[in-house]
Regions:
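A short beta-strand submotif of the Rossmann-like class I SAM-dependent methyltransferase core
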Residues: 119-122
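Conserved N-terminal segment of class I S-adenosyl-L-methionine
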Residues: 1-110, 116, 133, 193-194, ...
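S-adenosyl-L-methionine-dependent methyltransferase catalytic module, highlighting the catalytic core
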Residues: 7-31, 93, 127-248
């Protein structure tokens, strides 16, 4: 996927699934949005930022914005999305002030017009992550990014690589890669965190008692290891990395 038109066609299919399948993935995205919203709020707390306006770039069906609205966080909530189908869904959600379609490259807003920007699980999907992050940072005074750290032993398995390709991941990142993207965009990390998938997300696709027991054990093992030895955990399995970034000081 080399351009925004190709990206748009790819993701349009993901938001145009038949009824039962669409409902299932809608629940999946809403479940994932809980942890993502917690990350945004916690990073803003650490950086002492209380945004009165928030722009979610690549907002999908608006699940994250909806969760922020439910928690009363972020002030005026606006989303930008590349697909018509997702925009239509997001506009139906309560608490979101506006959702617009954009070209995947240029943010249609003046400089520093939003106090907070969000790129949650977006940068791994685009051809030039630093370029998009720099553009979002132009329009937003601070930006929260979140990416999966997939440069690990588990993600090297053939089935994992196939899944990453199926969902449109163009980059397999580690923490150093993510921080490098931030630097290339002219930004500095002010606060960061990482954690494995939440228990509820691990259990979502587990069918049957045995599968749920196995998924629960996997979650417990990973959460414990990440809590004790986070560097080792990141080398073994995927964790989600989030950082709040602001423009680097001029020299």
């Amino acid at each position: 996927m080399e351009d925004s038109a190709e990206l748009q066609r790819f993701y349009e299919q993901g938001y145009s699934l038949p009824g039962p399948e669409a409902e299932r993935f809608s629940r999946w995205r809403s479940l994932g949005a809980i942890g993502k919203a917690e990350h945004v709020i916690e990073l803003c707390r650490r950086a002492r930022i209380e945004p009165s306006s928030t722009l979610d770039v690549g907002c999908g069906d608006g699940a994250l914005l909806s969760e922020l609205a439910r928690r009363g966080f972020g002030g005026r909530l606006v989303g930008l999305e590349i697909t018509d189908a997702a925009v239509a869904i997001a506009r139906q959600r309560k608490g979101i002030d506006a959702v617009e379609r954009y070209d995947g490259q240029s943010v249609p807003a003046p400089d520093a017009s939003y106090e907070l920007g969000v790129l949650s699980h977006v940068l791994e999907h685009v051809p030039d992550p630093p370029q998009l992050l720099e553009e979002v940072a132009r329009a937003c005074q601070a930006v929260v990014i979140e990416v999966p750290l997939e440069a690990n032993l588990s993600a090297r398995r053939h089935t994992k690589r196939e899944h990453a390709a199926e969902v449109g991941h163009l980059h397999s990142l580690d923490r150093a890669d993510a921080r490098s993207i931030v630097r290339e965009a002219g930004l500095t990390v002010r606060a960061e965190l990482a954690d494995p998938l939440p228990r509820e997300v691990q259990l979502f696709f587990a069918q049957g008692a045995r599968a749920r027991i196995k998924a629960n054990a996997r979650w417990a093992t990973r959460a414990t290891l990440h809590g004790m030895l986070p560097d080792l955990a990141r080398r073994l399995f995927t964790v989600h990395y989030a950082a709040l970034c602001t423009p680097s000081p001029s020299e």
